[in-house]
């Protein structure tokens, strides 16, 4: 990642800390991966605190594929089958079947309905019957070990919300440009600044976690 673009957001460790602070304050975070991977920026929010307004922003400026990042434990709790048995996608993204809240929604498409679905899926006592399948929210299963196991936006989301003190569940969506193309780092950073989001890279988070685990050992 071009460090010049990121310099105004501090060092790698400062960027992670700023991201955690943003989540604790109920704000979003722009998570960038490497140029030689997807080369994309994802807007992420803690599932517990995401507002209808934030969901609307995500739908308006994102790819439209609003994803709910979950742990394997939560996936099993909700009895969500993986979308395919043999995942042949380029980066092995862990999509499950799509979901909709069983109660409290209309068509499931609106920002309010999608937030209702997210809330239903992450509730402490959530059970499979609380969700209909298919739906308009796309759960993603994170790999155990987070970004130290797989350097994806899914794992970064779970790591960040967990480090910030929330349940291990977060919402993400890729940022797109107005013409429908994928936003790259310069556009992602500009968008984050306009919408009071922190900016962090997956590389930052890997370094941060490794250092903290080294100190703890």
Curated annotation (Swiss-Prot):
Cofactor binding comment, as recorded: Binds 2 divalent metal cations per subunit. Magnesium or manganese.
Amino-acid positions noted as binding Mg(2+) 1 in the UniProt annotation, renumbered to this chain: 38
EC number(s) given by UniProt: 4.1.99.12
GO molecular-function term, one example from the UniProt record: magnesium ion binding
Cofactor: Mg(2+); Mn(2+)
Reactions it catalyzes: D-ribulose 5-phosphate = (2S)-2-hydroxy-3-oxobutyl phosphate + formate + H(+)
Site (Essential for catalytic activity) location in chain: 136, 174
Entry's Gene Ontology cellular component terms: cytosol
Pathway connected to this protein: Cofactor biosynthesis; riboflavin biosynthesis; 2-hydroxy-3-oxobutyl phosphate from D-ribulose 5-phosphate: step 1/1
Record: residues binding Mg(2+) 2: 38, 153
Pfam families: DHBP_synthase (PF00926)
GO biological process, one term: riboflavin biosynthetic process
Keywords of this entry: Lyase, Magnesium, Manganese, Metal-binding, Riboflavin biosynthesis
Residues at which D-ribulose 5-phosphate binds: 37-38, 42, 150-154, 174
Family as reported in the entry's similarity comment: Belongs to the DHBP synthase family.
NCBIfam families per record: ribB (TIGR00506)
Quaternary structure and partners: Homodimer.
Purpose: Catalyzes the conversion of D-ribulose 5-phosphate to formate and 3,4-dihydroxy-2-butanone 4-phosphate.
Protein name per the record: 3,4-dihydroxy-2-butanone 4-phosphate synthase
Protein's organism: Klebsiella pneumoniae subsp. pneumoniae (strain ATCC 700721 / MGH 78578)
Organism taxonomic ancestry: Bacteria, Pseudomonadati, Pseudomonadota, Gammaproteobacteria, Enterobacterales
Gene encoding the protein: ribB
């Amino acid at each position: 990642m071009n460090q010049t673009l990121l310099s105004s957001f501090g060092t790698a460790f400062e960027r992670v800390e700023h991201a955690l602070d943003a989540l604790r304050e109920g704000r979003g975070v722009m998570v960038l991966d490497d140029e030689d991977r997807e080369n994309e920026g994802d807007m992420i929010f803690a599932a517990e605190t995401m507002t209808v307004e934030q969901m609307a922003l995500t739908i308006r400026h994102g790819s439209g594929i609003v994803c709910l990042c979950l742990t394997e434990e939560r996936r099993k709790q909700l009895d969500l089958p993986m979308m395919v048995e043999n995942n042949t996608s380029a980066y092995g993204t862990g999509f499950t079947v799509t979901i909709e809240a069983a109660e409290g929604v209309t068509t499931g498409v609106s920002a309010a309905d999608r937030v209702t679905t997210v809330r239903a899926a992450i509730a402490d006592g959530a059970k499979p019957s609380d969700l209909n399948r298919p739906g308009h929210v796309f759960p993603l299963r994170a790999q155990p070990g987070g970004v130290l196991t797989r350097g994806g936006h899914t794992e970064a989301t779970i790591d960040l919300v967990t480090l910030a003190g929330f349940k291990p569940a977060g919402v993400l969506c890729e940022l797109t440009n107005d013409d429908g193309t994928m936003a790259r780092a310069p556009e992602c950073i500009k968008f984050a600044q306009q919408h009071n989001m922190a900016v962090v890279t997956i590389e930052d988070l890997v370094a941060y976690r490794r250092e903290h685990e080294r100190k703890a050992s």
